[in-house]
Amino acid sequence: MAKILHIFNTINSLRKRYYIAAAGKQSLIKLLSEAEVAEQVYNSNAIENSTLTLEETEKILLQINLDRYITEREIFEAKNLARVVSYIDTRAKEQELTLDVILLLHKMLIANIRDDIAGRFRKDGEWVRVASHIAPDPKEVVERLEKMLAGYNANSHENIIKRIALLHLTFEYTHPFIDGNGRIGRVINNYLLIREGFVPINIKFIDRKMYYEAFKEFEEKGTIRIMEEIVGKALTNSYHKRLAYLEGAQIITLAEYAKKYKISHSNLINKANRQTIEAFLEKGVWKIGVRQNKNNL
């Protein structure tokens, strides 16, 4: 509990710094968002067992030919998700999240992959299973999602990390679609974060084991501690990255930082993983913003 409370307090502090640093820098913020799309797409698809690497994902989005055969499905998965990620970056500020919005996002995601199921919830008789979890009866989907959104909105006084964690677990437990639930669920997280004035998060493929443990915890105990930690760390990581750029820090790798200041690299990595230093993961590499006259640790 103490760890989660610390993350809650850290987020509030980082958010205030971000608003100060972001003033008059909308063009830089836009560039950071655009540069992040490929990483968002790669990680979200990789969690769902896509074989694409980050480099291959970037090439597909830039319409560059790849060196190996890629299925048409994986190509559309990358392009469609990139379109959705870019769409919500502006749309979330204009439109409240509703079931109709969720259906639209799903239609954009699954188009040209499974047009027969794109943009609709599971119908009567369409059951789905994820590992040992059998999703609720299709007849319950709409009611469960309406209750999920109502609960999220009613708890506006709660910390955003707790609200996002609970909503995400509830959405994935419901598994309202035949396909695309995980990717849409992570998109919804960012839709709500952006709408509430926070920065989007990127749940990393390297955290997949912990991510699935969060679902197991929720199903078996009804608790959300692990997902709170995942969302909290992802949010601090996102703020650390943006603040490094917006505050004009010199951005170097943690390996370079360790060498320059004669600090244990493995110790820095451990701190970065816990997000107890202002490090951030960018394209699979841990980095940190070095500021003059400031202790970065």
Stretches found by the model and what they are:
Residues M1-D179, R183-L297:
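FIC/Doc superfamily catalytic core
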